[in-house]
Amino acid sequence: MDTEAVSFEDYRDCLKDLATVNALTLTHGPVLTWLDRATRNLAPNERATVLDVGYGYGDLLRRVHDWSRRKGRLVDLVGIDLNPMSEPIAKAATPSDVSIDFRTGNVFDYTPERPVDFVISSQTTHHMSNEELATFIRWMEQVAARGWYIADLHRHPVPFHVFGALARVARWHRFVQHDGPVSIARSFRKADWKKILHAAGVAPEAAEIRWHVPFRLCVSRLK
């Protein structure tokens, strides 16, 4: 899907199935757990701005909205995505009473109009080169006042083979069936992230690399 010309309908159906995959594989759990920790010292009436890079269907930001309601946290939610089709699709999938500011644009050209407390990004960084990733981390270091979190895949034979079989049985969108194993093959091991963090100028002790079930490798930093 990264290189193929895609219709609006195909892209929407693909994102919808990816959101189903995210729900079934507990993709957003580590992000929400980190936000629990990251906001622990905020006053009850203190607002925090959360920016999601590469929001796709918008399902992570909707989960963050639900989390904020459960926890009684005051949050402003913003998303930026490179694909112009993501914005109308994410907006259409979001209830009218859920306030999320979905934007279209290149993150490297994006300068937030208001201070951002936390930057999050899920299942997006495997689409970047190592050089782009180092630039992205440096960008987050500048933009995120309190911290940032990257959730992505762990490159391993087990999810590579299991996902392909599961996607075929579930009859998910053809892009999901094809791109899932490709994404796993393009994803990361701990040594990869250490090199990327070093290239970005982030000290080893300043960031945390943590593995989560099922085969998620997440990188975070609290300031």
Where are these regions (language model features)?
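C-terminal alpha-helical "lid/dimerization" subdomain adjacent to the S-adenosyl-L-methionine
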Residues: 153-198, 208-209
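Conserved beta-strand signature within the Rossmann-like core of class I S-adenosyl-L-methionine
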Residues: 145-153
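A conserved beta-strand element that flanks and buttresses the S-adenosyl-L-methionine
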Residues: 120
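Core SAM-dependent methyltransferase catalytic element
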Residues: 208-223
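A short, conserved alpha-helix within the catalytic core of class I
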Residues: 128-139
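Hydrophobic adenine-recognition pocket in adenosine-nucleotide-binding enzymes
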Residues: 124
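Class I SAM-dependent methyltransferase SAM/SAH-binding core
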Residues: 51, 57-59, 63-109
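Class I SAM-dependent methyltransferase Rossmann-like catalytic core
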Residues: 4, 8-39
